[in-house]
Amino acid sequence: MSIEQVDTLVVGGGQAGLAMSEHLSNCGVSHLVLERHQIAERWRSERWDSLVANGPAWHDRFPGLEFSEIDPDAFAHKEMVADYLVAYAEKIAAPIRCGVAVTTVQSNIGRPGFRVETSEGLIEAVNVVAATGPF
């Protein structure tokens, strides 16, 4: 079985994982983002139906992408936030793989880096970023 090699592995494809992906790309760092479900899954399936963003649309956004179809002073509904995060991942061309669960992360013994077990096989990474859970 071959082991995939990456410089930096980002675990999680939500707000934090996408923000990290953008910064790594801007710095020229080769990386891969793994998301066990779909982008922004928790916004879709683990939030109250009535949830809205905690700030107005003009504020709660990433650089270079406005919320569409909403007044800038309005508060985006959870589905709108999830759709926005998908659009942002596409905009920045995030190198993301959805449907891949990370099961174990271990430090390499005697050399730098990490050995990461996933639902699709092994990955060795120099750096691992945990971007799971709330932003």
Task: Show where each model-derived region lies.
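N-terminal Rossmann-like FAD-binding beta1-loop-alpha1 element of flavoenzymes
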Residues: 3-33
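A conserved short coil-to-beta-strand element within the FAD-binding core of flavoproteins
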Residues: 98-113
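Short loop/edge segments at beta-strand edges and connector loops
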Residues: 96-100, 118, 132
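Glycine-rich active-site loop/strand segments that organize a redox cofactor
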Residues: 30, 34, 41-82
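Helical element adjacent to the flavin cofactor pocket in flavoenzyme catalytic cores
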Residues: 79-96, 100-102
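Conserved Rossmann-like nucleotide-cofactor binding loop
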Residues: 16, 38-39, 135
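Short, flexible hinge/linker loops that cap or flank conserved catalytic cores
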Residues: 2-3, 122
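Short hydrophobic core segments
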Residues: 9-11, 116, 122-135
